[in-house]
């Protein structure tokens, strides 16, 4: 359905926010997360990891796994390096601890995010 068909304006059917206007939550030294507006059962987020920093704990995934896009910089997972423009899918039940030597911005989402996040 388009905004015109409903008789309302486009602003009534969407939310548009500059990413950097969303307050960042520091989850560890040099690691920041922004939670974006999203529908039920989907958690959408942006993570920034500053140069030389590592996620503060091991990130464990449930039965849906985790999907992310490296927006800028370089993500390091184990011995693998992922540059901007790389899509990464972590399988259900997987775990990882991301880090970056150059700094990185990630856009990701978790489907069916029934657990609480801190």
Regions found by a protein language model. Name each.
Residues 1-45:
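A short, N-terminal "cap"/entry segment at the start of jelly-roll beta-barrel domains
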Residues 28-33, 38-62, 76, 80-81, ...:
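Conserved short histidine dyad/triad with adjacent acidic residue
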Residues 47, 88, 108-109:
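Preference for bulky hydrophobic residues occupying beta-strand positions
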């Amino acid at each position: 359905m388009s905004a015109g068909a409903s008789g309302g304006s486009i602003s009534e059917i969407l939310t548009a926010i500059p990413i950097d206007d969303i307050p960042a939550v520091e989850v560890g030294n040099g690691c920041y997360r922004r939670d974006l507006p999203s529908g039920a059962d989907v958690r959408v987020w942006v993570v920034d990891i500053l140069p030389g920093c590592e996620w503060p704990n091991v990130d464990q995934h449930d039965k849906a796994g985790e999907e992310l896009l490296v927006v800028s910089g370089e993500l390091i997972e184990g011995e693998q390096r992922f540059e901007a423009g790389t899509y990464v899918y972590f399988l259900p039940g997987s775990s990882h601890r991301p880090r970056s030597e150059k700094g990185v911005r990630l856009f990701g989402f978790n489907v069916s995010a029934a657990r609480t996040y801190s």
